[in-house]
Amino acid sequence: GAHAQFRVTAHQEGWDRIPPQAQKDGFWFQQSVLANMDDDAAMEEVMLFGRDNGHYPTFDLFKFYYVIVDNYTKEIQYISDEIYVTDKYALTVEDRNNDGISELYIDYFKDGKFTVDERGYNLRTTRCYDRIEWSPESKNIKPQQP
Protein backbone atom coordinates (compact mmCIF):
# COMPACT_ATOMS: atom_id res chain seq x y z
CA GLY A 1 0.00 0.00 0.00
CA ALA A 2 0.87 3.67 0.20
CA HIS A 3 2.96 3.18 3.32
CA ALA A 4 5.21 0.48 1.87
CA GLN A 5 8.02 2.89 1.06
CA PHE A 6 8.19 4.23 4.61
CA ARG A 7 10.10 2.74 7.48
CA VAL A 8 9.27 3.98 10.94
CA THR A 9 12.28 4.22 13.21
CA ALA A 10 11.89 3.13 16.81
CA HIS A 11 12.16 5.81 19.48
CA GLN A 12 15.42 4.66 21.04
CA GLU A 13 17.36 4.12 17.81
CA GLY A 14 19.62 6.51 16.08
CA TRP A 15 20.46 9.28 18.53
CA ASP A 16 23.79 9.55 16.72
CA ARG A 17 22.01 10.44 13.48
CA ILE A 18 20.57 13.68 14.82
CA PRO A 19 22.45 16.82 13.78
CA PRO A 20 23.06 18.84 16.99
CA GLN A 21 21.43 21.98 15.55
CA ALA A 22 18.23 20.00 14.90
CA GLN A 23 17.50 19.60 18.61
CA LYS A 24 15.96 22.68 20.23
CA ASP A 25 16.42 23.16 23.95
CA GLY A 26 14.04 21.06 26.06
CA PHE A 27 12.78 18.98 23.12
CA TRP A 28 13.44 15.29 22.56
CA PHE A 29 13.53 13.10 19.49
CA GLN A 30 10.23 11.18 19.30
CA GLN A 31 10.12 9.39 15.95
CA SER A 32 11.26 9.60 12.39
CA VAL A 33 10.52 8.21 8.96
CA LEU A 34 12.64 7.86 5.83
CA ALA A 35 11.09 9.19 2.63
CA ASN A 36 11.99 10.86 -0.61
CA MET A 37 11.12 14.51 0.06
CA ASP A 38 12.80 16.15 -2.95
CA ASP A 39 13.88 15.50 -6.54
CA ASP A 40 17.15 13.67 -5.92
CA ALA A 41 17.53 9.96 -5.25
CA ALA A 42 18.89 10.30 -1.70
CA MET A 43 16.32 9.75 1.02
CA GLU A 44 15.45 12.31 3.66
CA GLU A 45 14.77 11.55 7.30
CA VAL A 46 11.77 13.44 8.65
CA MET A 47 12.22 13.84 12.42
CA LEU A 48 9.63 14.79 15.02
CA PHE A 49 10.85 16.44 18.23
CA GLY A 50 8.48 17.02 21.13
CA ARG A 51 7.92 17.66 24.80
CA ASP A 52 5.04 17.41 27.25
CA ASN A 53 2.74 20.41 27.48
CA GLY A 54 0.23 19.42 30.15
CA HIS A 55 -1.82 16.42 31.24
CA TYR A 56 -5.61 16.36 31.51
CA PRO A 57 -8.06 13.61 32.55
CA THR A 58 -8.82 12.45 29.00
CA PHE A 59 -5.88 13.74 26.95
CA ASP A 60 -2.30 14.96 27.03
CA LEU A 61 -0.90 17.96 25.22
CA PHE A 62 2.45 18.17 23.48
CA LYS A 63 4.61 20.80 21.86
CA PHE A 64 6.43 19.68 18.74
CA TYR A 65 8.35 20.67 15.64
CA TYR A 66 9.76 18.92 12.59
CA VAL A 67 13.16 18.66 10.97
CA ILE A 68 13.91 17.22 7.54
CA VAL A 69 17.49 15.96 7.24
CA ASP A 70 19.29 14.63 4.18
CA ASN A 71 19.88 11.00 5.13
CA TYR A 72 23.23 10.92 3.30
CA THR A 73 24.88 14.28 4.08
CA LYS A 74 23.00 14.82 7.40
CA GLU A 75 22.36 18.44 6.34
CA ILE A 76 19.18 20.04 7.63
CA GLN A 77 16.90 20.80 4.69
CA TYR A 78 13.95 22.13 6.68
CA ILE A 79 13.28 22.98 10.30
CA SER A 80 9.97 24.31 11.65
CA ASP A 81 10.18 27.99 12.49
CA GLU A 82 7.37 27.63 14.96
CA ILE A 83 6.63 25.27 17.80
CA TYR A 84 3.23 23.62 17.39
CA VAL A 85 0.78 22.42 20.06
CA THR A 86 -1.21 19.21 19.62
CA ASP A 87 -2.87 16.38 21.54
CA LYS A 88 -1.06 13.60 19.67
CA TYR A 89 2.30 13.06 18.02
CA ALA A 90 1.78 12.27 14.35
CA LEU A 91 4.33 11.83 11.62
CA THR A 92 2.30 11.66 8.41
CA VAL A 93 4.51 11.46 5.34
CA GLU A 94 2.72 10.47 2.14
CA ASP A 95 2.90 11.03 -1.60
CA ARG A 96 -0.74 12.03 -2.03
CA ASN A 97 -0.30 13.68 -5.43
CA ASN A 98 1.65 10.71 -6.84
CA ASP A 99 4.58 12.74 -8.15
CA GLY A 100 7.18 10.45 -6.58
CA ILE A 101 8.01 13.03 -3.90
CA SER A 102 6.49 12.72 -0.44
CA GLU A 103 4.87 15.54 1.54
CA LEU A 104 4.71 16.03 5.30
CA TYR A 105 1.16 16.59 6.61
CA ILE A 106 0.81 18.21 10.01
CA ASP A 107 -2.07 19.21 12.22
CA TYR A 108 -1.91 21.47 15.24
CA PHE A 109 -3.89 23.89 17.38
CA LYS A 110 -4.31 27.32 15.78
CA ASP A 111 -1.98 29.77 17.55
CA GLY A 112 -1.42 27.08 20.22
CA LYS A 113 -4.74 28.06 21.82
CA PHE A 114 -7.30 25.75 23.43
CA THR A 115 -9.85 25.74 26.23
CA VAL A 116 -11.07 23.12 28.69
CA ASP A 117 -13.80 23.22 31.30
CA GLU A 118 -13.02 23.60 35.00
CA ARG A 119 -12.55 19.85 35.44
CA GLY A 120 -10.12 19.60 32.53
CA TYR A 121 -12.55 17.96 30.09
CA ASN A 122 -14.14 19.18 26.88
CA LEU A 123 -11.09 20.18 24.88
CA ARG A 124 -11.96 22.87 22.35
CA THR A 125 -9.58 24.17 19.76
CA THR A 126 -9.35 25.17 16.12
CA ARG A 127 -7.25 22.62 14.27
CA CYS A 128 -4.99 23.68 11.42
CA TYR A 129 -3.77 21.36 8.70
CA ASP A 130 -0.63 22.19 6.73
CA ARG A 131 1.26 20.46 3.97
CA ILE A 132 5.04 20.81 3.92
CA GLU A 133 6.54 19.96 0.57
CA TRP A 134 9.51 20.46 -1.68
CA SER A 135 9.18 23.38 -4.05
CA PRO A 136 11.04 23.14 -7.37
CA GLU A 137 11.01 26.93 -7.82
CA SER A 138 12.90 27.63 -4.63
CA LYS A 139 14.69 24.24 -4.59
CA ASN A 140 13.78 23.71 -0.97
CA ILE A 141 11.05 22.44 1.30
CA LYS A 142 8.43 24.84 2.57
CA PRO A 143 5.04 24.82 4.28
CA GLN A 144 1.83 25.33 2.30
CA GLN A 145 -1.58 26.13 3.64
CA PRO A 146 -3.91 23.60 1.95
Predicted segments, located by residue:
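Acidic, small-residue rich beta-repeat scaffolds with periodic aromatic anchors
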Residues: 1-23, 92-146
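Extracellular beta-rich ligand/substrate-recognition surface
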Residues: 19-27, 83-84
